Regions:
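Negatively charged, low-complexity tracts enriched in Asp/Glu with abundant Ser/Thr
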Residues: 2-26
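Charge-rich, solvent-exposed alpha-helical interaction surfaces
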Residues: 88-92
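Short acidic DE-rich linear segments
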Residues: 93-97
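General helical secondary-structure elements
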Residues: 3, 82, 86-87
């Protein structure tokens, strides 16, 4: 799903955090941030190509939410995404697409 297809403009933010990569602390900046979970574990953002991704902080994997015409949202990967994260993503995507 490409952000360029959105009905309304997202209010993007930038988020910088420190992550541990093989014992080395690195600072990473996410651009085009759409939503961050209240516990700061999950982030929904658009990558540089405009593709929406959901990612768990300090993890090397991400997932791509896909929305059907009827508003249902599914995921193409195998991340164990909590229900509250899925519900927020569905609410956000249904509002904008």
């Amino acid at each position: 799903m490409n952000i360029m297809n959105a009905k309304k403009d997202f209010k993007f933010k930038t988020h910088t955090c420190k992550i541990d990569v093989l014992g080395i602390e690195k600072e990473i900046t996410y651009n085009n941030v759409i939503w961050i979970s209240p516990n700061k574990l999950w982030i929904l953002y658009a990558n540089d190509d405009g593709i929406i991704q959901v990612e768990k902080f300090n993890d090397v994997y991400c997932d791509y939410p896909l929305m059907y015409d009827n508003g249902d949202v599914v995921y193409d990967g195998y991340l164990n995404i909590p229900k509250y994260v899925k519900e927020n993503i569905k609410r956000i995507l249904n509002k904008h697409f």
